[in-house]
């Protein structure tokens, strides 16, 4: 009888150890999968940021709420007569944005100036035409347009896509001098279109130069241990810590960049109106507070305001003093 119970206990303990081992292995595989997924997200974001060719594209990837504001400011830039009340209202609504709008404007102007495009430059005529050393021109150089500027990837170069030829009147002089300088027409290539094009075989991913990084050494007296699903190994503390204390790269909380940070919890951003508006409208018989979006019953009316010698504003349920022009 005792032998049978011993055998049963041994079988039960073996089963428990087997289940625990499977659970630990499953958590380890899940942690590795999560880390790979985080790296993939980071690499994809890095590629998108590197490929951004305008400030608008960069903001759209990195800070979506500033991108919305930037689009609005571009839309409002043509409106010169914006009253001070409206301007103050908007500056309050956009107080949570990450970048200053004026700074973005300066950066955008600088970016546009450095884009790949035809630029006026000076070229040496003799070198351009491949003339011999005993022939030279006066003036020796002419102004033409050539492609120049920066591209957004290391594997491409700013190159011309269309060319025209312009004629310049110059003096051609040969040595030894046998006659007076001759006035001749010279045709010089003038770039009219430019584009960032690959200089060689294109790889699926652009080569990214990085500084050499020394792998982080584990100074813990014992090797890394497997941690529970909601925890990670911390090399500095030599123990398992909660993911909130030591999050994986790319998994940090970026909720402050989302729409609630820009407009508040009860509002959403209206790109057409270029301002924050309430998410849910109030029923027809209630008035909506413009700041906290709460619904309330209007106590004022046209009659009550007339008795106070004031003007009734139905949208805000407020009585306003008459403004009489002189």
Curated annotation (Swiss-Prot):
Disulphide bonds in the chain: 116-158, 147-194, 151-196
Q: Which UniProt keywords apply?
A: Angiogenesis, Cleavage on pair of basic residues, Developmental protein, Differentiation, Disulfide bond, Glycoprotein, Growth factor, Mitogen, Repeat, Secreted, Signal
Q: How does the record describe the protein's post-translational processing? A: Undergoes a complex proteolytic maturation which generates a variety of processed secreted forms with increased activity toward VEGFR-3 and VEGFR-2. VEGF-D first form an antiparallel homodimer linked by disulfide bonds before secretion. The fully processed VEGF-D is composed mostly of two VEGF homology domains (VHDs) bound by non-covalent interactions.
Q: Which GO terms describe its cellular component?
A: extracellular region; extracellular space; membrane
* Compartments, as annotated in UniProt: Secreted
* Family under the similarity heading: Belongs to the PDGF/VEGF growth factor family.
Additional comment: Indolinones; MAE87, MAE106 and MAZ51 inhibit VEGF-D induced activation of VEGFR-3.
Role played: Growth factor active in angiogenesis, lymphangiogenesis and endothelial cell growth, stimulating their proliferation and migration and also has effects on the permeability of blood vessels. May function in the formation of the venous and lymphatic vascular systems during embryogenesis, and also in the maintenance of differentiated lymphatic endothelium in adults. Binds and activates VEGFR-3 (Flt4) receptor.
State what protein this is by name: Vascular endothelial growth factor D
From which source organism is this entry? Rattus norvegicus
Specify the taxonomic lineage.
Answer: Eukaryota, Metazoa, Chordata, Craniata, Vertebrata
């Amino acid at each position: 009888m005792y032998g049978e119970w011993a055998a049963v206990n041994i079988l039960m303990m073996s089963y428990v150890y087997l289940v625990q081992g499977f659970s630990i292995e499953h958590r380890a595989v899940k942690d590795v999968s999560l880390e790979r997924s985080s790296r993939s997200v980071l690499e994809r974001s890095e590629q998108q940021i590197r490929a951004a060719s305008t400030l608008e594209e960069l903001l759209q990837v990195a800070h979506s709420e500033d991108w919305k504001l930037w689009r609005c400011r571009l839309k409002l830039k043509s409106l010169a007569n914006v009253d001070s009340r409206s301007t103050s209202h908007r500056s309050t609504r956009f107080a949570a944005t990450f970048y200053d709008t004026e700074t973005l404007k300066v950066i955008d102007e600088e970016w546009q100036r450095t884009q790949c495009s035809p630029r006026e430059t000076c070229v040496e005529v003799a070198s351009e035409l491949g003339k011999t050393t005993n022939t030279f021109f006066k003036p020796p150089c002419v102004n033409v347009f050539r492609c120049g500027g920066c591209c957004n990837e290391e594997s491409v170069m700013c190159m011309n896509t269309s060319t025209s030829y312009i004629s310049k009147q110059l003096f051609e002089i040969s040595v030894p001098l046998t006659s007076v300088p001759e006035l001749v027409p010279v045709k010089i290539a003038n770039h009219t279109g430019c584009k960032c094009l690959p200089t060689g075989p294109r790889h699926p991913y652009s080569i990214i130069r990085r500084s050499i990084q020394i792998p982080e050494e584990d100074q813990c007296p014992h090797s890394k241990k497997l941690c529970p699903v909601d925890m990670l190994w911390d090399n500095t503390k030599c123990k398992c810590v909660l993911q909130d204390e030591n999050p994986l790269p790319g998994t940090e909380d970026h909720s402050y960049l989302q729409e609630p940070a820009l407009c508040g919890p009860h509002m959403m951003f209206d790109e057409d109106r270029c301002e924050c508006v309430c998410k849910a409208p109030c029923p027809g018989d209630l008035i909506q507070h413009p700041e906290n979006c709460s619904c309330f019953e209007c106590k004022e009316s046209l009659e009550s305001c007339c008795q106070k010698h004031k003007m009734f504003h139905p949208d805000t349920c407020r009585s306003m003093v008459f403004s009489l022009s002189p």
